[in-house]
Amino acid sequence: MPTPSMEDYIEQIYLLIDEKGYARVSDIAEALSVHPSSVTKMVQKLDKDEYLIYEKYRGLVLTSKGKKIGERLVYRHELLEQFMRIIGVDESKIYNDVEGIEHHLSWESIDRIGDLVQYFEQDEVRVKTLRGVQKANEEKSN
């Protein structure tokens, strides 16, 4: 299993390849706000652990193992953002909140959150009911 830091790199590499068709060390460094030498070290570790294939000065490609995990990590991130929107978290806080929790949830918890998101999305009345509960709770606390 990749560490949380490895997950961040795999997720970002997956997104870059999906968006641009490739991922360079400089692109990864910029996206993650880290020094290129840190990216090189992590990419070498990910290569050793068979998440990607890295050739110095030529770039990198995700292995099937890396693609599968990258896909799952992007899904997890997007699902948690969706969940935060449904429960009414302020849009400006969603990204940082998701970054703060995504590595600490089990895949079982992610799957249950997915069930809950699906439940709310199947009937917009459910979201409206939730907003009513939130408003009532807000009024109680004021």
Swiss-Prot record:
Residues reported to bind Mn(2+) 1: D8, E99, E102, H103
Residue ranges occupied by any HTH dtxR-type domain in the UniProt entry: 1-63
Pfam families the UniProt entry points to: Fe_dep_repr_C, Fe_dep_repress
UniProt-annotated location(s): Cytoplasm
Main subcellular location: cytoplasm
Cellular component GO terms, alphabetical: cytoplasm
UniProt key word DNA-binding: yes
Activity regulation annotation text: DNA binding is strongly activated by Mn(2+).
Residues annotated for Mn(2+) 2 binding in this entry: E11, H77, E99, E102
One GO MF term: manganese ion binding
Keywords assigned by UniProt, alphabetized: Activator, Cytoplasm, DNA-binding, Manganese, Metal-binding, Repressor, Transcription, Transcription regulation
GO annotation terms (biological process): intracellular manganese ion homeostasis
Family designation: Belongs to the DtxR/MntR family.
NCBIfam families: PRK03902.1
Subunit text: Homodimer.
Role noted for this protein: Central regulator of manganese homeostasis.
Name of the protein in question: HTH-type transcriptional regulator MntR
Organism this protein belongs to: Bacillus mycoides (strain KBAB4)
Gene this protein is translated from: mntR
